[in-house]
Amino acid sequence: MKHMKFLTFFFCIAFAVFACSSNNETDPNAGGLPDKEEPLATDFAKGADISWVTEMEHKGMKFYNTSGVETDCFQLMKDLGLNAVRLRVWVDPKEHDNWCNTADLVTKAKRAAELGMDVMVDFHYSDWWADPGQQHKPAAWKGLNLADLKKAVAGHTADVLNALKAAGVTPKWVQVGNEIRSGMLWDEDAALSGASYDVRECDVKGSNSTSEEVKYRENFANLAAFINVGYDAVKSVFDDAIVIVHLDNGYDNELYTWFFDELRANGGKWDMIGMSLYPYWTMLEHKEYTCLLYTSDAADEEDSV
């Protein structure tokens, strides 16, 4: 196994003051990219997740620098020293006005690339937000057998990335899943689920249940399989893209040790580990240091392989 890379993204979204006024939305079907600026000269990725920017602009929100000058959001990020953006993509968010669908992703990725910024694509594999408390299958994927679920993951991944390629955008990183501490693509049937541990009925069924007692069984083998077909789909389109497996609670050494030991044991593939930390919501109490313990432990382990 090649040496593992590690990445901790502290996405500091440095939005300035908003003011409401009309604004034209960028056409996602616009032509190819103009000449790009050279990427910012640095080996350190300093980025922000600004996936909501097109929706904000559509609602008339504007962005300003510290001098009060109205500035394009992407340009503002670059002016603040950022050299990368993370952009999420959902499968079919029609109930959310199609924000963060493939076309919207391409629109934003082109704007970032035009400024010489690196792009990370964040696949949620859901029709809306996926996180440890909700890893719901896209509506169109419900009822699929395991083989067809894998094909759906691979097909969606490749389709989105091919759309970026057609637009002249080459992502540097691709996340296969978002905050998948609890797995992805949950199902009541453990044979079809990608849960990493047993999940409550109220989480699997969402608003259709309030039961916290019934738990649906984990299937880490399926989770590894879903990650792997996503990984392979990424490499089939962008062979040099860095594939990230992303968890939250970056301070939790035991979580990362358990998760990636299980993923390795089930044949999982990844190039980089993505860690999220949320100081605003988390009482760190020096936990920021423990996130380094896993990276140190795992790096030592990889060096010994």
Role assignments for model-derived ranges:
Residues 258-287:
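Aromatic- and acid-rich polysaccharide-binding/catalytic face
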Residues 17-38:
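Bacterial Sec-dependent N-terminal signal peptides
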Residues 76-199, 215-219, 224-234:
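Substrate-binding cleft and catalytic face of glycoside hydrolase catalytic domains
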Residues 59, 132-133, 186-189, 251-266:
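Distinct, well-ordered alpha-helical segments
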Residues 63-77, 157-160, 254-263:
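Short, acidic/polar
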Residues 172-178, 227-254, 304:
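Aromatic-lined carbohydrate-recognition surfaces of secreted/lumenal glycan-active proteins
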